[in-house]
């Protein structure tokens, strides 16, 4: 399906969000293995759970892009991801996770306020709801990470 220019612009924004979700997934997978310290097992379990959650986000974004008519087999954007930090320190890993999640909360709020308006109905309402759900999940992660960082 050929996208009109406004839909194509929105699709590029979504592909950027997909790359971020892949970065999050890979970060949490790596952190589950590299995290050190006395509470390593608890952090390992936490990061592994978050990796699983991020994998679900990746699937949700890919499905939404397909629903908008984006052919994921025709774009390298669908397989690329952004880089992330490597560390053994639980504090550094949690702090980085907080920065990542805070960034996507801001991105998703912007998508809802600005970018979704580029779409026509019913895609506009669908994407507003999609991004609102993603925003809630990521904001809950931000709040949880803030609480975790208070105790380390």
Report the location of each language-model feature:
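Conserved alpha-helical segments that form or flank metal/cofactor-binding pockets of metalloenzymes
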Residues: 39-76, 141-148
């Amino acid at each position: 399906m050929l996208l009109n220019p406004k839909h194509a612009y929105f699709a590029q924004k979504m592909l950027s969000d997909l790359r971020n979700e892949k970065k999050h997934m890979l970060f949490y997978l790596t952190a589950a293995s590299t995290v050190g310290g006395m509470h390593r097992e608890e952090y390992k379990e936490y990061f592994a759970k978050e990796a699983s959650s991020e994998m679900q986000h990746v699937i949700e974004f890919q499905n939404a892009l397909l629903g908008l008519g984006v052919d994921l087999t025709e774009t390298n954007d669908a397989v690329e991801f952004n880089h992330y930090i490597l560390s053994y320190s639980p504090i550094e890993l949690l702090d980085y996770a907080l920065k990542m999640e805070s960034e996507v909360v801001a991105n998703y709020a912007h998508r809802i306020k600005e970018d979704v308006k580029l779409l026509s109905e019913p895609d506009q309402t669908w994407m507003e709801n999609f991004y609102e759900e993603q925003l809630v999940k990521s904001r809950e992660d931000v709040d949880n990470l803030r609480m975790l960082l208070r105790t380390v």
